[in-house]
Curated annotation (Swiss-Prot):
It is a single-pass type IV membrane protein. Belongs to the CASP family. The modification Phosphoserine is found at S586. The gene is CUTL1. This is Protein CASP. GO terms for biological process: intra-Golgi vesicle-mediated transport. It is found in: Golgi apparatus membrane.
Amino acid sequence: MAANVGSMFQYWKRFDLQQLQRELDATATVLANRQDESEQSRKRLIEQSREFKKNTPEDLRKQVAPLLKSFQGEIDALSKRSKEAEAAFLNVYKRLIDVPDPVPALDLGQQLQLKVQRLHDIETENQKLRETLEEYNKEFAEVKNQEVTIKALKEKIREYEQTLKNQAETIALEKEQKLQNDFAEKERKLQETQMSTTSKLEEAEHKVQSLQTALEKTRTELFDLKTKYDEETTAKADEIEMIMTDLERANQRAEVAQREAETLREQLSSANHSLQLASQIQKAPDVEQAIEVLTRSSLEVELAAKEREIAQLVEDVQRLQASLTKLRENSASQISQLEQQLSAKNSTLKQLEEKLKGQADYEEVKKELNILKSMEFAPSEGAGTQDAAKPLEVLLLEKNRSLQSENAALRISNSDLSGRCAELQVRVTEAVATATEQRELIARLEQDLSIIQSIQRPDAEGAAEHRLEKIPEPIKEATALFYGPTAPASGALPEGQVDSLLSIISSQRERFRARNQELEAENRLAQHTLQALQSELDSLRADNIKLFEKIKFLQSYPGRGSGSDDTELRYSSQYEERLDPFSSFSKRERQRKYLSMSPWDKATLSMGRLVLSNKMARTIGFFYTLFLHCLVFLVLYKLAWSESMERDCATFCAKKFADHLHKFHENDNGAAAGDLWQ
């Protein structure tokens, strides 16, 4: 199994999946560029072929047509084959680009197998050591009085413990070195990911800018066409309105002329009627005939003039109608042309809008990028004007470098503080042990001091000698300095010597108390430092989550997904937990339940949280509960014992009373007393 894992690890390491993914990514970009170039060259070739057909005579076109068709068929076959190859490459690229690299997992598995094998070796060695220790214990049980053997065994045990400790330290150092190497590799991968993200972001911004310029140009052209169309329509409308007014005037004049012609016709008919009457009246004088002839001639002249005027007006009306129809045709043709141009521009605008649908959030992204520039990448107001001229990639790189330097400084300070914290914890444990020893020593000294004070007040003769036997040897040695070499064995201590001994013990006690207070102050300082480090670690974790959120925002642009490591997965899970609607909903529900609780329930819950969140409070609560249980059990035991004693006492008294009655009043009223007792 280990050989298979090792061979797989070597194979995947030689295979270098990440390098293959980068090469495939580069090849995909080159293919995309070549597709664009092929499309442009194809368009140019089509235009050149059209120009060739236009500028080439018919017989030459007929001769070249088969060659062109075969050449075009070969080009179509080559383009089809290249498209199929590109499609197959893109299919392989899509499947391989998101495949995670199994080298770290295989490396970790191999290391775990090595660790398991090493653990088995250590276990076997430990078993051997245990067997050896059991043998030594048997030998030690057999030869208890051999001090040399005991010392040798102790030395061997110390050596074994030292070897185990050294092995544990070497394993810890190897693990720390491995973690440092993994962290450096992850930082390098993160930098590469950020560089690729910035390049893709730059390409996307360039495309968006080009599309934006094309859209603005199209909008300006469309606006110019609309303004021209509006101006021409207004001019044509004004011209048509003028022509219509002229036409109405001509129609009015024609109607007036027709009415005048009708009146003249009526007058002519009346004149003809009068002429007929005059012809009938032939006997009339010559003067009247002359007058009638004159009136008839004048009416005829006037009628001819009116008819000429009517004909001229009819010609004017026809001419105006012809010009109106011509103007309508011209305006209709111009309107159709403008409508065609407008439809073409609208189709172009729709195409551009469809192209911009993928970048519909350009303004929002631009606004967010400006906000990011202003908030995250501008350290001061003076540097804001200088950073405004820098591109986003430079700002991201500078921010990444500053964050890396801050992270390194914080890591160094964290390691220093953790070392100091470990030293302080060791010191605190030593101080606590020393304090406990000092407390025990103080208690013994106080007990000995009370014994010495009781010696000064003997109850009777010989009591001092009896109590001097209870004094420990160190106190006897300490008091021997005050007695002198010929101190009486049966007398009381002098008052000055006891006072000096009390002053020594009290000063030593004060020194121990001051030292204990110093150690407690150092312990509080160490606890405060630990809390500050914990808060700083929480803030760093929050900053890392925010940085991961920004990286995820930058990775939201179209592109291949980069391989994720353990750190990214951990911060990704924390980021998803922050964005999880179920967790936020559960928090809101817990808050709502907490607000709907009664005040005493809130007090009980707060007290429980306070007790469970603090180690000292948990310890106090545990011992307090234990004390209450013991007290209740003691009270119950006392009550049961008192009741049993009362019962036993009552039984004993009744028995004694019955014995007394049987013994002393046996003859008189023994039966009555028995009935009374029953």
